[in-house]
Amino acid sequence: MKKLTKTHSHRQQKLASIINEALIEILRRGKMLDSRLFDCPLTITKVIVTADLKIANCYFLPFNTKLTIDEIMDALNNSKNAIRNFITNKINMKFSPDIRFHYDHGFDNAIKVAHLLKDL
Protein backbone atom coordinates (compact mmCIF):
# COMPACT_ATOMS: atom_id res chain seq x y z
CA MET A 1 0.00 0.00 0.00
CA LYS A 2 1.29 3.44 -0.92
CA LYS A 3 1.80 6.10 1.72
CA LEU A 4 -0.49 9.09 1.41
CA THR A 5 2.11 11.57 2.59
CA LYS A 6 5.61 12.10 1.31
CA THR A 7 8.39 11.73 3.81
CA HIS A 8 11.45 13.87 3.43
CA SER A 9 14.88 12.70 4.46
CA HIS A 10 16.88 14.51 7.09
CA ARG A 11 19.21 15.85 4.37
CA GLN A 12 16.26 17.24 2.39
CA GLN A 13 14.84 18.95 5.47
CA LYS A 14 18.22 20.34 6.52
CA LEU A 15 18.96 21.69 3.03
CA ALA A 16 15.46 23.19 2.79
CA SER A 17 16.01 24.93 6.13
CA ILE A 18 19.38 26.34 5.04
CA ILE A 19 17.93 27.56 1.74
CA ASN A 20 14.97 29.14 3.54
CA GLU A 21 17.28 31.04 5.90
CA ALA A 22 19.54 32.11 3.02
CA LEU A 23 16.56 33.34 0.98
CA ILE A 24 15.29 35.38 3.91
CA GLU A 25 18.74 36.87 4.43
CA ILE A 26 19.35 37.82 0.80
CA LEU A 27 15.83 39.26 0.40
CA ARG A 28 16.32 41.31 3.56
CA ARG A 29 19.70 42.63 2.38
CA GLY A 30 18.49 43.26 -1.16
CA LYS A 31 21.99 43.14 -2.63
CA MET A 32 22.41 41.75 -6.14
CA LEU A 33 18.65 41.48 -6.60
CA ASP A 34 16.33 42.85 -9.24
CA SER A 35 15.43 46.42 -8.26
CA ARG A 36 11.71 45.56 -8.34
CA LEU A 37 12.21 43.42 -5.23
CA PHE A 38 13.48 46.33 -3.10
CA ASP A 39 10.00 47.59 -2.17
CA CYS A 40 8.26 44.24 -2.35
CA PRO A 41 7.97 42.49 1.02
CA LEU A 42 7.93 38.73 0.48
CA THR A 43 7.41 35.86 2.85
CA ILE A 44 9.03 32.55 2.03
CA THR A 45 6.31 30.15 3.14
CA LYS A 46 8.13 26.89 2.47
CA VAL A 47 11.03 25.30 0.65
CA ILE A 48 10.76 21.75 -0.63
CA VAL A 49 13.88 19.98 -1.89
CA THR A 50 13.61 17.00 -4.23
CA ALA A 51 14.92 13.60 -3.14
CA ASP A 52 18.03 13.92 -5.33
CA LEU A 53 18.74 17.38 -3.78
CA LYS A 54 19.00 18.95 -7.24
CA ILE A 55 15.89 21.16 -7.19
CA ALA A 56 14.61 23.46 -4.46
CA ASN A 57 11.02 24.58 -4.92
CA CYS A 58 10.58 27.84 -3.02
CA TYR A 59 7.08 29.11 -2.28
CA PHE A 60 6.50 32.79 -1.57
CA LEU A 61 3.70 35.14 -0.61
CA PRO A 62 3.89 38.90 -1.30
CA PHE A 63 2.39 41.50 1.04
CA ASN A 64 1.20 45.04 0.26
CA THR A 65 2.80 45.38 -3.13
CA LYS A 66 1.78 47.06 -6.36
CA LEU A 67 3.53 44.37 -8.40
CA THR A 68 1.61 41.51 -9.96
CA ILE A 69 2.53 37.90 -9.24
CA ASP A 70 4.00 37.63 -12.76
CA GLU A 71 6.20 40.69 -12.19
CA ILE A 72 7.42 39.28 -8.88
CA MET A 73 8.13 35.90 -10.50
CA ASP A 74 10.06 37.66 -13.28
CA ALA A 75 12.09 39.67 -10.75
CA LEU A 76 12.87 36.55 -8.70
CA ASN A 77 13.89 34.63 -11.82
CA ASN A 78 16.13 37.53 -12.90
CA SER A 79 17.80 37.33 -9.48
CA LYS A 80 18.04 33.54 -9.49
CA ASN A 81 21.79 33.37 -10.27
CA ALA A 82 22.69 35.79 -7.48
CA ILE A 83 20.45 33.89 -5.07
CA ARG A 84 21.95 30.55 -6.10
CA ASN A 85 25.50 31.89 -5.66
CA PHE A 86 24.60 33.18 -2.21
CA ILE A 87 23.12 29.80 -1.26
CA THR A 88 26.18 27.97 -2.65
CA ASN A 89 28.33 29.90 -0.17
CA LYS A 90 26.05 28.78 2.68
CA ILE A 91 26.03 25.05 1.95
CA ASN A 92 28.86 22.54 1.81
CA MET A 93 27.90 20.33 -1.13
CA LYS A 94 29.31 19.37 -4.52
CA PHE A 95 26.53 21.25 -6.27
CA SER A 96 23.92 23.83 -5.48
CA PRO A 97 20.29 22.95 -6.18
CA ASP A 98 18.38 24.69 -8.93
CA ILE A 99 16.07 27.27 -7.34
CA ARG A 100 12.50 27.39 -8.63
CA PHE A 101 10.03 29.96 -7.37
CA HIS A 102 6.30 29.36 -7.00
CA TYR A 103 3.47 31.53 -5.74
CA ASP A 104 1.93 29.91 -2.65
CA HIS A 105 -1.80 29.51 -3.29
CA GLY A 106 -2.39 28.08 0.19
CA PHE A 107 -3.69 31.31 1.70
CA ASP A 108 -5.94 32.02 -1.29
CA ASN A 109 -7.34 28.51 -1.02
CA ALA A 110 -7.94 28.92 2.72
CA ILE A 111 -9.91 32.12 2.09
CA LYS A 112 -12.02 30.37 -0.57
CA VAL A 113 -12.77 27.50 1.81
CA ALA A 114 -13.68 29.94 4.58
CA HIS A 115 -16.11 31.74 2.25
CA LEU A 116 -17.64 28.44 1.17
CA LEU A 117 -18.11 27.36 4.78
CA LYS A 118 -19.59 30.74 5.66
CA ASP A 119 -22.15 30.40 2.86
CA LEU A 120 -23.39 27.02 4.14
Curated annotation (Swiss-Prot):
Annotated HAMAP family:
RbfA (MF_00003)
- The gene behind this protein is rbfA
Q: Whom does it interact with, and what assembly results?
A: Monomer. Binds 30S ribosomal subunits, but not 50S ribosomal subunits or 70S ribosomes.
Report the function annotation for this chain. Answer: One of several proteins that assist in the late maturation steps of the functional core of the 30S ribosomal subunit. Associates with free 30S ribosomal subunits (but not with 30S subunits that are part of 70S ribosomes or polysomes). Required for efficient processing of 16S rRNA. May interact with the 5'-terminal helix region of 16S rRNA.
Concerning its family, UniProt says:
Belongs to the RbfA family.
Where is this protein chiefly located?
A: cytoplasm
Q: Which organism is it from?
A: Rickettsia conorii (strain ATCC VR-613 / Malish 7)
Q: What InterPro entries does the record tag this protein with? A: KH_dom-like_a/b, RbfA, RbfA_dom_sf, Ribosome-bd_factorA_CS
Keyword terms = Cytoplasm, Ribosome biogenesis
Q: Name one GO biological process term.
A: maturation of SSU-rRNA
Q: Does the keyword Ribonucleoprotein apply?
A: no
Q: Which terms in the Gene Ontology molecular function aspect does this entry carry?
A: ribosomal small subunit binding
Q: Which NCBIfam families does this entry report, sorted A to Z? A: PRK00521.2-2, rbfA
Localized where? Cytoplasm
Name used for this protein in its record: Ribosome-binding factor A
- Assigned GO CC terms: cytosol
